[in-house]
Amino acid sequence: MFFDREKELEELTDLVSSKPSMITFTYGPINSGKTTLLIEFSKRLPREYIVFNINLRGRFIREEKDFIKVLFMKKEESESIKNSYKGIPIPEGILNEILENPFLFLEEYFEEINNSGRIPVLILDELQVIGDLRIDDLLIYKLFNFFVRLTKELHLAHVFVATSDSLFLERVHGEAMLHGRSRFMLVDDFDERTTLEFLTSNGLSEEEAKIAWHYLGGKPSYLVDLLQRSRIRVEDYCKEALKWRTSQILDSLYTLKGRKLRKVIELLSKFRENDEITYGPLSEEIVWSVRNNILFADPRERKLRPQGRLEKHAIELALEKLRNNF
């Protein structure tokens, strides 16, 4: 369900209106609407653009060959050129040939599209799933080198990479090979005004919308799920969501012991009084809290905060329960 991302859409449209020159990383807290935004962006592009939107979420990728196969899709012989694809269309039977040098094939393919007067837009969603694959060297570095060649060197295609994994993004942000060759675009949860507009425009009363904002904040996935549970009172839904999220955080905390547990509790306790804090080097407690989707780290701003408003409430309740249990 798409709603009021005109500012972000305008920014994305501005990026593709000029010659390709940088890789654009779209990032943000979990479930903040990055995928939905990029799909809507793809739909709105004029016919001069051809979009290749490849989502790696849920794909079983164990080695480089698996990733390359995900990039491509079988092309029917009679199929005409479309505006949008979920993979790079190739004739049946040539995949093994492409596996020998996939990046050369893609470069020549995008060059062919350019020569026809159209502009390729490559979107890779949830790219972090290949972050640690090693074949000769890290696949991710091969891929970044290729993206730099497509954008900065050859100006053949616009490249967008989306991720909710802020540890992966931290690694990318500090990567020397991408300095001056990449930009970062935050896709955040809705603010209060947008949240209230979204909920009231979809049937909730102003009072119900304010209750939802108090508990859930502006995370689109939570709000959409709330709207789909129309038979449940808004406050009941919100309290149940908070109970469930608190239990999830407690389950994660119960796996820790000793010094690490104390350090994580010390970190999370800072959010009783603060919505966000600054951070320096990534400590083990920050890495753990981010990896368990409790906190969101923004490497561009060096800010650390709960993944959302619901998570902030759940952190407070989880810490209270821990104090009562020990």
Curated annotation (Swiss-Prot):
One of its GO terms (molecular function) is ATP binding. ATP binds at G28, P29, I30, N31, S32, G33, K34, T35. SUPFAM superfamilies: P-loop containing nucleoside triphosphate hydrolases (SSF52540). Gene3D superfamilies: P-loop containing nucleotide triphosphate hydrolases (3.40.50.300), Winged helix-like DNA-binding domain superfamily/Winged helix DNA-binding domain (1.10.10.10). InterPro entries: Archaeal_ATPase_domain, ATPase_dom, MJ1010-like_2nd, P-loop_NTPase, WH-like_DNA-bd_sf. Keywords: ATP-binding, Nucleotide-binding. Pfam families: ATPase_2 (PF01637), MJ1010-like_2nd (PF21690). Belongs to the archaeal ATPase family. PANTHER family: AAA+ ATPASE DOMAIN-CONTAINING PROTEIN, YALI0E33429P. This is Uncharacterized ATP-binding protein PYRAB12000. It comes from Pyrococcus abyssi (strain GE5 / Orsay).
